[in-house]
Amino acid sequence: MNEVLALNGEIAKGLILALGNGRRQVAKTVCNAILDLSISQAGREQLCKALSVERLLSLFYQEVQVNRVLAVHQGMRKEAVECSKGRPMNESFVALILAAAVTLINSSTEDFLDRIPSELVKRCLPLLQEIWKKSRCPLLHGNGQRCWHIMKNGLPTTIFKLSMNQNLATWNYDKIRVTMFGDAGSEFVTFVSKYWEKSPVLLSEAIKNLEKENGVFRCLINSFNHQSTNDILDSVLMKLVSCQPLASDELDINCFLNENSSLGSPLIYGLDIRVVKAQQVSSESFKKKEVHFFDSSSGTLFSEGDYATKCKKAFQDGFTIALRGMEFRFAEIASITRGLADLFGQPSVGANLYITPPGSQGLTFHYDDHCVFVWQLFGQKYWFVSSSPTSILPRLYEPISSLPSIENEKEGGLQMFLNEGDILYIPRGCPHEAHTKNDAYKPQQELCSGLSLHLTLSMEVEPPFAWEGFAHVALHCWHEMQKEASDCIPSMEARRRKVFSVFLLHVAIKLIADDVSIFRKACLIAAKFVEHHADTLRLNQKANFLKIINIIDFSSNFMETFEKTVVQEANDNFLEWMRWLRHLPQRGDEDVKIDFDDPSRMRSELIELSIKGNEEMKDEFFQTKSRFCRSLVYEEACRMFQVMLEKYRRTRNQYMNGMLALHT
């Protein structure tokens, strides 16, 4: 019966008209009817077409003005108590409105949400955020009433979805460049050509304008209350929620939302926060190990307020507090990471915060698989950066086993104290450690002067945005341009051989990149350089790419590639690295497309094709490789790369906007 009613659009329109009746009892009945109709997808679609979300949000705004949020919260607490005593609870009008709105918004498409008037969203969002924060009261846990359950569990998703396409403030990339590297455009050029992904450098001279008016830095430090140690810890730790990670190759924010039903949940240890210190293994050894204050293997969920008290105790005991994903929690940090990502032509930049007490070390001697800019915000910290990086640039999440021992690496490295405002650049693969000065003689109330608070801005070079990734984009772009010629080939088998020769060349590029560092370097084609330096640097980027093409031309090995794909690596995971290529456009019939979404199926079909004639496959591979290396169009590849970059940025910004709204 519900399905039949749901398909009748006039019923939905009639319900929405009745919401404007002006009588509360009628409106309550309508909200209950909307909830019943929303059980089916057809009902939700008809209600959305009837502009029910706009009407519900308008009614919600009228009912709950800013100065009445507290009263709403008090009513919720009262009803929660009544429920806990086993008495029947009359669900409030606000709860009914919210439950209906939440149900419809959370099941709506992005296109539909974009049609909700932006001014209405701006008016309602602060109220929704305030009610959600207050609804996290422990008294409401276990409340069984339908509307409260829908509202409490669905409201974080509603806030996320209404916020994800909002335009938030971002520091212009040029302002970030001047703040971090200096006024002259040549200073950023010098950094890129001399230090980027090569060697560490202290950028203190660029930030000496602390004595002047540095808007970026001042805005950053003013986001923390730094009157005392407790104030700093409170400003950092309170009111945080978990930021479940977004898959690096996920470009549909709705997939993330559908797979994560725990938006707004408490912090998770190891994912959002770590509380750690480095301790010597023994008095005879310089070697240290990391000790966690909490159980590092349990994935503990921290309840509101409880974890902050425990973290303060850990801090007094010498533990460093490390918070991940600060760009999702503080708008000031988000605006900096967006500007920095734009400057370097990357989809996003991460930000972690480290608070270390006096005389302590948080992390042991280690290297990162990403480049970092260490920005000292408060206090001082001593850094040692080794002069012996790893033999090859590490890829993200691919550990390199050979880490130099700290005993052998103390000579010849970079050693310095970072003062407030200083920025230290550390390339990926460069081992380092840091500790604070010992101020144990100072009384507890003065420990703020000895603590260190620094922000690390993480430049993670993801596979699509390294030179290896650009080579894959260039090959894909070239293959798309060849499809008209393939249409003239009458034989299905011959057309498939051409497709699989391109597929194997993608694998060959990956195998070459495993051993050749230039393929692992960040592709800076989309980076923002000062105008009078831009042409020279663009030529340098093109020269890098031509080197890569020459390496592909001379180093591609059919037998090695074929054996790795078909014989030696018979497991399904070997080809998973190429799944990000599914985001690139493909045209034509299915027989001229590569199934990047299911590379194991491609492998199975390749085996069948090779049984019929491996020599033909080998000849086709070398012909494809030669034609690609000699006839690719660099400018077309740049355009496709830029389009892909913007797709990644859009999803990352949606995620960032949504998470920031849950921390506002």
PLM regions with names:
Residues 1, 7-181, 195-199, 402-417, ...:
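Fe(II)/2-oxoglutarate
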Residues 6, 47, 194, 211-213, ...:
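Residue-level detector of secondary-structure boundary/capping sites
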Residues 192-194, 235-422, 430-495, 659, ...:
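Active-site region of the double-stranded beta-helix
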Residues 85-329, 336:
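A generic N-terminal leader/anchor concept
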